Amino acid sequence: MGEASSSSGHPRQNPHVLGYGFHGAMPNSLPSANLFEQQGGANYFGELEEALMQQVATLRRTQQTATTTSTLHHGDTTPFSTTATAAATARPPPTLDIFPSWPMRSLHTPKEGSNVTADTTDSESSSKNNSNQNASSDQHVLVGDMAGQFDQIPQQEQHKKMATNSPTHSSKTGKALDPKTMRRLAQNREAARKSRLRKKAYIQQLESSKLKLAQMEQDIHRARSQGLLLGAPGGNTSSGAAMFDVDYARWLEEDSQRMAELHGGLHAHLPDSDLRAIVDDTLTHYDHLFNLKGMAAKADVFHLITGMWATPAERCFLWMGGFRPSELLKTLTPQLDPLTEQQVVGICNLQQSSQQAEEALSQGLDQLHQSLAETVAGGSPLDDPNVGSFMGHMAIALGQLSNLEGFVIQADNLRQQTIHQMHRILTVRQAARCFLAIGEYHNRLRALSSLWASRPREILVADEGNCGELSIAAHPSESQYSAF
């Protein structure tokens, strides 16, 4: 009976077992049941267990490799290597496709008379399936975490760059700054930038002033060595006068160069176009001299009118701080031959108009001298001891002295206009010869001054003896009027 019951109960269990093993099989499929009986349930579950263990071992090796890689890179500051990144982000090896895509429990509930072995097999396969699913889910979670770390690294770097470059974040607190603070920071940066620019400009100005001062010292030393600067009595030379002396010494050097160019151009028979360029440059050079004298007249008019900037021989021919235009024309006319009739008439008219202007300026200067002398002589402290009255007369005298500046400037304008008129009347080559004659005339006067200053000592002693004899001869005449 037991055997019969077991044999009779066995066909009832086959549909359930086949239902768990094969999804598409029918419960009453006899060929499938016979095949399962021939192979044996033990062999089937043994192969299933072996495949699951291989899969679990593969998952454990993958997990250990990922853990080792993450530990190494957490201890190092260098970024992950390309191999580790590829291994971490790679997909897990494919699993055996031996499980159904739907839940393992069959929709058909087992009957009450099922075999205990079938239930045990069902529980074992379910537990192994759950462990396989848990291992797969753990592997996916681990790979997802590592991929997230790899994704977070460039995102963190990008956020750092944005925080560094963005003006709305503070480098210390990491909080957004309000517009008022941002505006104040921008103003501070702009003020610092302007301060640096001002400091740089100030340093450059100091350097240029230092170089200019050194150049001025060299020019003054050179001018004094040439006997051009004798200085005012007592050393009361103003800064404007000293500046003009330096500029005039430099102008003389440049004038010598232009005279050499004119001399070379005339002897080389340059074309009129090339020679005209040299003549025009020389005329501009004289205009620059008159501009310098105008600034010096405003700074210290007495320095110009007394001729302290010129040599002693030049002072003998000085008129209101310069040469007389009419006298210069008389000196130049014989050296400009041959002249056309029209040129002679033009030069004569220019000379006549220059003389008239000179006389007018001389009369005005004489009147100024007379009025100035009367102002200074009036209001003597002996007659009027009032200090206020005396200071009033001094104020009037100062106002009259300011007119002296105007006379010197008008005289320079007359000299400048005379040179320009001569440039218009003469041809290019005649104008070149004219400028050469003017330069040579003043060079000879300066040479005469140098010779006078460097004359031998015996001549100086003889001059002193002559002066002594004159003074002795003058004493008897003075003694004749001693009674008076």
From Swiss-Prot:
Region (Basic motif): 180-200
Organism listed in the record: Oryza sativa subsp. japonica
The protein, known as: Transcription factor TGAL4
Cell location: Nucleus
GO biological processes: defense response; DNA-templated transcription
UniProt feature, compositional bias: Polar residues: 1-11, 163-173
Origin superkingdom: Eukaryota
Function: Transcriptional regulator involved in defense response.
Taxonomic lineage of the native organism: Eukaryota, Viridiplantae, Streptophyta, Embryophyta, Tracheophyta
Subcellular location, principal: nucleus
A GO MF label: sequence-specific DNA binding
Region span, Leucine-zipper: 206-220
Residue intervals of the bZIP domain: 178-222
